[in-house]
């Protein structure tokens, strides 16, 4: 019968870590299994939200072999199963070869922890395979990798088996194979080495997550691909593709193109390393002071130690490095780096938005796009700050603390710190993930409550009409009560989190303090060591109090960053072809040849449109609304690319030249002129931003608006207001004409430029437009036919086709569509003239 003896082979503590030319087996098989178990638990915690959110209906419709590769995955599954079973086999081997000798307790603990860690790895492998099959079933495929947690778990296992080789010459290990027990343990080590090495290599390859060589066919009756993709995108875990997100983020950490800021980054990282050293040195000097006071050391030694301690404390700050000189210096230096990163991201997004097509902008709400851009910029700088200067330093402090206590105190202290910190982080992440749903529900209800109040106040008159004040107050009260109920859950869960953290801190401090006090009474440690332990532990725990906040903020920032990167992934619809050259403008001959075009709905807006505008001529486009007249102008300006056919200017296909050169030769006067919230002078100067004040005034005089501008108290420096609301419709049109005059293009496009004006303003604007269009190729989209009677050619567009073409007189003589439109408009104008006196008489 096998009995269980002391924790280690020899009576005493786990340490020292190194003895008899090798690592202590007791120390090694306590630290490694505990580390692997903590990593496995943490990986499971991070995987659970992902598992919970990614379980859509119909995700299991694939057969076992229809997903990613199965043959290498079976091998990976077998190795993971062996990794979970081998520790128990090793324990059985120990029991079978013990020959009545007591079995050290650490072997039992190591076997259980190693098996549980292996089981965590096995479960994660199965879950990730299942998630890969789900995404494939939903028609989504990206570059798959195992999660960082699983890879780290397998890496640590393989590294631990290699670490055992440093004890090759130690008689405590099984390398000599002197008896049956050592031979069995050596054989099991070889098997573990092969298994862990195989899992490490296969983990990097991830065969169970890679696609088959054939193409998967998804039956339409079984899968709604479009809805599945939307659902998956909305429900996927924040931590999915964590490594890819970190790589994207790391690109903004290093300020490319600025050697000075790169040096600042290196200095900041060096200061961060100095803070880690200070967090170790401050408790050590505090311990030395206590020991010197206990030993009644000379005043000189005590004064020097106290002075050094206070100086280090000044550098460190209030115990956590958050307000010390080093931290403040790092924060000060980082301001420029943060501004550089923010500026770079903002300009990247803004430039990309201007490269996207008109089709994309018409389908998006500008406020939503700008909100994504703002949040994305803040998320990049916030993530860099949280990860680089909060999370990573905190984890580094924990690792340094574990190593320090294991080496200079006892391995038990390192184990206590490790277990407490692991439990602390795990519980923080679990509870934070759990309470996220309360926070989300509270935010949703807060928006609903605010919307209820806004809606009631906006409809103030309606509330008064129906004497519904008490009803509205009651509805608002119910919304507040519902919000406060959710707020209570969120606040209560935060209290639970804080109390859980406090409990873990207390248990860890109690265990370590009792052990430290015991060693002090045994005269293995000094009184100062007890003080050092308590100071160091509290110092480690203080930044961890904010770890839940960091975790939640990192989640939020990752979501915002994903939205920003999704925005940056939007393809530019209209692109310059590789090698495209500038437009060689000559006289302005425009040709449309068999042009077909359709918007996103698939319905053809233009069908086989062909026409030619000779240099200096005016072409008018008329027809009912929605016929495709404005679309022709947008195609010529290349807001869209045509489906088929060809558009040429001076014999050059406009799709073969750069967009900038094309648009530099075209001036547009739209129906609704939108002005920038700037001065009148700057709005006119927008036609050519390098123009001087004299040129701006000359353009305004040519457009007939100079006198109106000078009538304003501030003249050309008058602010036009948002979207030019301080100016009348006629004044805004004249500003647009002045812009076009200043641009001096070779081609003019008039998109119903006077249709929104009254008759007197229209006639005045027409006179200004005639000056602008003189000797320039002009295309006019007209609603009032009387404005285009002098056009060199008139095209009648109906349902995307040219149904008639010719001059005004010729079209009237045909008695077709144009003649009917003319008669209808003439009748409407006569009716309008007849009713004016009657209206005046009333």
From Swiss-Prot:
Record topological domains on the Cytoplasmic side: 48-72, 128-147, 207-263, 313-375, 419-499, 551-842
Membrane topology annotation: Multi-pass membrane protein
Documented effect of changing residue 192 to Q: Decrease expression; does not affect substrate binding; does not affect ATP-binding; loss of plasma membrane expression
Mutagenesis or variant effect for residue 677 to Q: Does not affect N-glycosylation. Does not affect N-glycosylation. Does not affect trafficking from endoplasmic reticulum
Post-translational events: N-glycosylated.
UniProt KW Lipid biosynthesis keyword: no
Taxonomic superkingdom: Eukaryota
Record topological domains on the Lumenal side: 1-26, 94-106, 169-185, 285-291, 397, 521-529
Main location: membrane
Catalytic activity, as annotated: heme b(in) + ATP + H2O = heme b(out) + ADP + phosphate + H(+); coproporphyrin III(in) + ATP + H2O = coproporphyrin III(out) + ADP + phosphate + H(+); pheophorbide a(in) + ATP + H2O = pheophorbide a(out) + ADP + phosphate + H(+); coproporphyrinogen III(in) + ATP + H2O = coproporphyrinogen III(out) + ADP + phosphate + H(+)
Segments crossing the lipid bilayer: 27-47, 73-93, 107-127, 148-168, 186-206, 264-284, 292-312, 376-396, 398-418, 500-520, 530-550
Effect the entry attributes to changing residue 57 to T: In MCOPCB7; uncertain significance; hypomorphic mutation
Record text on activity regulation: ATPase activity is inhibited by MgATP with an IC(50) of 1.03 mM and up-regulated by coporphyrin III> hemin > protoporphyrin IX. ATPase activity for hemin is up-regulated by glutathione. The ATPase activity is impaired by increasing copper concentrations (0-300 uM). The ATPase activity is stimulated in presence of glutathione for increasing copper concentrations (0-300 uM).
Gene3D superfamilies: ABC transporter type 1, transmembrane domain, P-loop containing nucleotide triphosphate hydrolases
Induction or repression: Up-regulated by cellular porphyrins (at protein level). Up-regulated during erythroid differentiation (at protein level). Induced by sodium arsenite in a dose-dependent manner.
Subunit field text: Homodimer.
Domain notes: Contains two independently folding units, the N-terminal transmembrane domain (residues 1-205) and the ABC-core domain (206-842) are respectively responsible for the lysosomal targeting and the ATPase activity.
Pathological association: Microphthalmia/Coloboma 7: A disorder of eye formation, ranging from small size of a single eye to complete bilateral absence of ocular tissues. Ocular abnormalities like opacities of the cornea and lens, scaring of the retina and choroid, and other abnormalities may also be present. Ocular colobomas are a set of malformations resulting from abnormal morphogenesis of the optic cup and stalk, and the fusion of the fetal fissure (optic fissure).
Name listed for the protein in its UniProt record: ATP-binding cassette sub-family B member 6
Gene: ABCB6
């Amino acid at each position: 019968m096998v009995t269980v003896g002391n924790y280690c082979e020899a009576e005493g503590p786990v340490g020292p870590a190194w003895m008899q030319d090798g690592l202590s087996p007791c120390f090694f098989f306590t630290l490694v299994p505990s580390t692997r178990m903590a990593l496995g638990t943490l990986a499971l915690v991070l995987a659970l939200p992902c598992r919970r959110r990614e379980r859509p209906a119909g995700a299991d419709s694939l057969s076992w072999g229809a997903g990613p590769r199965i043959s290498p995955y079976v091998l990976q599954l077998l190795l993971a199963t062996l990794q979970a079973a081998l520790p128990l086999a090793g324990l059985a081997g120990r029991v079978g070869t013990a020959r009545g000798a007591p079995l050290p307790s650490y072997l039992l603990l190591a076997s259980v922890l190693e098996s549980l860690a292996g089981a965590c790895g096995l479960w994660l492998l199965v879950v990730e395979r299942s998630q890969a099959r789900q995404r494939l079933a939903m028609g989504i495929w990206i570059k798959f990798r195992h999660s960082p947690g699983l890879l780290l778990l397998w890496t640590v296992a393989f590294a631990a088996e290699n670490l055992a080789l440093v004890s090759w010459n130690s008689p405590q290990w099984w390398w000599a194979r002197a008896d049956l027990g050592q031979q069995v343990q050596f054989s099991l080590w070889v098997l573990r080495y092969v298994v862990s090495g195989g899992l490490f290599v296969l983990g990097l390859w991830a065969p169970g997550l890679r696609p088959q060589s054939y193409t998967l066919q998804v039956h339409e009756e079984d899968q709604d691909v479009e809805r599945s993709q939307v659902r998956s995108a909305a429900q996927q875990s924040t931590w999915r593709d964590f490594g890819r997100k970190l790589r994207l983020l790391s690109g903004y950490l290093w300020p490319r193109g600025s050697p000075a800021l790169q040096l600042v980054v290196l200095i900041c990282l060096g200061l961060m390393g100095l803070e880690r050293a200070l967090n170790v040195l401050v408790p050590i000097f505090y311990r030395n002071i206590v020991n010197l006071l206990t030993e009644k050391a000379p005043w000189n030694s005590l004064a020097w130690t106290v002075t050094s301690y206070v100086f280090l404390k000044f550098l460190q700050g209030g115990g956590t490095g958050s307000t010390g000189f080093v931290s403040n210096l790092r924060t000060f230096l980082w301001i420029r780096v943060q501004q550089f990163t923010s500026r770079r991201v903002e300009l990247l997004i803004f430039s990309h938005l201007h490269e996207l097509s008109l089709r994309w902008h018409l389908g998006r709400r500008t406020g939503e796009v700008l909100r994504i851009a703002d949040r994305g910029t803040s998320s990049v700088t916030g993530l860099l700050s949280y990860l680089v200067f909060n999370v990573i330093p905190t984890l580094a402090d924990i690792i340094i603390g574990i190593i320090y206590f294991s080496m200079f105190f006892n391995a038990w202290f390192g184990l206590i710190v490790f277990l407490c910190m692991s439990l602390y982080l795990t519980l923080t992440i679990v509870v934070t993930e759990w309470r996220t749903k309360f926070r989300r529900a509270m935010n949703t209800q807060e928006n609903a409550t605010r919307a209820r109040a806004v809606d009631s106040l906006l409809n103030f008159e309606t509330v008064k009409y129906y004497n519904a004040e008490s009803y509205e107050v009651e509805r608002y009260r119910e919304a507040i009560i519902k919000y406060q109920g959710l707020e209570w859950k969120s606040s209560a869960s935060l209290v639970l989190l804080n109390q859980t953290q406090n409990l873990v801190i207390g248990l860890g401090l109690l265990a370590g303090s009792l052990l430290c006090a015991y060693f002090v009474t045994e005269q293995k440690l000094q009184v100062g060591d007890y003080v050092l332990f308590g100071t160091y532990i509290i110092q480690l725990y203080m930044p961890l109090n904010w770890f839940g906040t960091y975790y939640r903020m990192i989640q939020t920032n990752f979501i915002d960053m994903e939205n920003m990167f999704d925005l940056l992934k939007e393809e530019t619809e209209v692109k310059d072809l590789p090698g495209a050259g500038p437009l060689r403008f000559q006289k302005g001959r425009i040709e449309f040849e068999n042009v077909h075009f359709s918007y996103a709905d698939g319905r053809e807006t233009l069908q086989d449109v062909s026409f030619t505008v000779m240099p200096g001529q005016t072409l008018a486009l008329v027809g009912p609304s929605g016929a495709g007249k404005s679309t022709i102008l947008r195609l010529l300006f290349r807001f869209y690319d045509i489906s088929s056919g060809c558009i040429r200017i001076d014999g050059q296909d406009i799709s073969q030249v750069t967009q900038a050169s094309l648009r530099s030769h075209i001036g547009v006067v739209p129906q609704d002129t939108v002005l920038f919230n700037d001065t009148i002078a700057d709005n006119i100067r927008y036609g050519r931003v390098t123009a001087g004040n004299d040129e701006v005034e000359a353009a305004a005089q040519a457009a007939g608006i100079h006198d109106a501008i000078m009538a304003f108290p501030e003249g050309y420096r008058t602010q036009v207001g948002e979207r030019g609301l301080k100016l009348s419709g006629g004044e805004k049109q004249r500003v647009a004409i002045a812009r076009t005059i200043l641009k001096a293009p070779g081609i003019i496009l008039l998109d119903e430029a006077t249709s929104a004006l009254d008759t007197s303003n229209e006639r005045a604007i027409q006179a200004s437009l005639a000056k602008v269009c003189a000797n320039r190729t002009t295309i006019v989209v007209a609603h009032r036919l009387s404005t285009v009677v002098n056009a060199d050619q008139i095209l009648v567009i109906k349902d995307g086709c040219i149904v008639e073409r010719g001059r005004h007189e010729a079209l009237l003589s045909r008695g077709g569509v144009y003649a009917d439109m003319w008669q209808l408009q003439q009748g409407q104008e006569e009716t309008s003239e007849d009713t004016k006196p009657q209206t005046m008489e009333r």
